[in-house]
Amino acid sequence: MWHLVVLLEELCERGINFRALAQSIFAQQWGDECCKSKTICDLKVIV
């Protein structure tokens, strides 16, 4: 899964909001609480 995280981080650096994608991916591991109103940029700190 790490390669996916790196890819999302690269896209995030380009200013793309992946909130919906992050919810579908990360909610399965950490639950919806960590994903609400956040971008993948915020979530990479958790990863």
From Swiss-Prot:
Protein known as: Putative protein PinH
Family matches, as PROSITE patterns: RECOMBINASES_3
UniProt entry tagged with the keyword Flavoprotein: no
The keyword Glycoprotein is assigned to this record: no
Domain Resolvase/invertase-type recombinase catalytic: 1-47
Family to which this protein belongs: Belongs to the site-specific recombinase resolvase family.
GO molecular function, one term: DNA strand exchange activity
Gene Ontology biological process: DNA integration
Top-level taxon of the source organism: Bacteria
Keywords: DNA integration, DNA invertase, DNA recombination, DNA-binding
